[in-house]
Amino acid sequence: MFKKEKIKIERKKLLELGRKIETLDLSNSNKYFLNLISLNSELFILIKDLINKEEKTSFISENYNIELKMLYNEYAIKDEQGTIIDFNPNDQTYLAAIQDLNFFYKDEYKSMLDRKEMFNSWLLEEIEIEIVKLDFNYFPNIYISPIIYKYLAFNI
């Protein structure tokens, strides 16, 4: 009914799989895929951890972009209702504020890029994991949508 198998796979492929699984409609027709997820709980914990690590590597740039938008909004020329009607990117106080922001984030940004580079090379490493697969000889009449079948064919 189920087969256990050890496979070698790049962490990056697991991360891609995790991203695709997040977008799948795991409705009732795909309950066998849900069973596969529960049988492979350790694998999916690993995938979730990879997704969290990836999100943490881009956190600093998001903060920088938010602060940049706040500066733009602060120095923009607005009408009485507060609607931005003009903006002078050469305004000296705005340029000084941008310089301060860039100086503050310079080291943060460099360390973020270093972490991202290390993370990307770490993702390319192969790891060995044990997975549980459905043996389709036992389930000849199961309907599995093409998208689910594609991921099952991916060895999961």
Name every feature range the model reports, one short phrase each.
Residues 2-156:
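A composition-driven surface/loop motif
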